[in-house]
Amino acid sequence: MKDVNLLKTNGVDVDKALELFGDMEIYNETFQDYLNGIDEKKSNLAKFKNLANWADYAIFAHSIKSDARYLGFTKVAEVCLKHEMAGKEQNQHFIETDYDHLLKTVDGMTDIVKRYLAGEQAGSNTKTPTQDSDIPKPAVSTPTINIPKESVIIIADDSPLIGNFAARILEPTYKVVLTQDGKQTIDLIEAGRYNVETLLLDLNMPNVGGFEVLEYLKSKNIQVPTSIITGEDSKDMINKAFTYNIVDMLVKPFSKDELLRVVEKTKNYNL
């Protein structure tokens, strides 16, 4: 049995997280999504740091920041935000000198998540071993682009945590397909296997980003009702995005109610 007090005593803002997720069941499932993706994100962070590719470094710092905000780890999110901004500003000195602090902070979050999922109780002096078999499997796999369905909603976001959270909310009503970068999204649309009712498009993705997808849709004159997903500190990107034919935007971290509102508005929008 999971003890939410373990999270609270470690500074996790559970109440704020539940405002986004709506209930404990979805919140708990999302912890596993975080664990599924964090090692790859850290690996990419290290890779782009070593390559001095600060733009992509900022993208992965942003992705970990978003996960931390959703899960209620506000202090972790603050550290990640500093690295995201340093990447955008190409502030190599800050990144190099604070990088170990970033890793220690993120690893601390990961440790708390593993202990919580393994059922450790608050105040326990003994950590419960976190075997893979002890941790519940995710309810939604990513990506799910090979599942045929006539009408779908595409959620394009490089974070499995955010994609799976949105899918869990929407799938009782809609068929959801998850993609993790712009190339997957373009390939899926080009394949023509689905009637895409709505596209929720993260602007800040590695490899092929959201703006490349918007440019592709515009150049091919493909009419897909599209709303963007972006960070609250991306005003320039938002202004640029609204030069394209988009319906609305979701600002991370968005709640269940905000997601449902934007999906309904986008789905019913007449292009």
Describe these PLM feature segments.
Residues 1-151, 267:
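Two-component system phosphorelay core
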Residues 36, 160-178, 219, 244:
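Two-component/phosphorelay signaling modules centered on CheY-like receiver
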Residues 180-184, 208-212:
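Acidic catalytic/metal-coordinating carboxylates
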Residues 187, 211-223:
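Short amphipathic alpha-helix used as the core "switch/output" element in two-component signaling
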Residues 193-200:
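Active-site beta3 strand of CheY-like receiver
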Residues 205:
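Receiver (REC) domain active-site loop signature in two-component systems and cognate sites
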Residues 212, 219, 233-248, 261:
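Alpha4 helix (beta4-alpha4-beta5 surface) of REC/receiver domains from two-component response regulators
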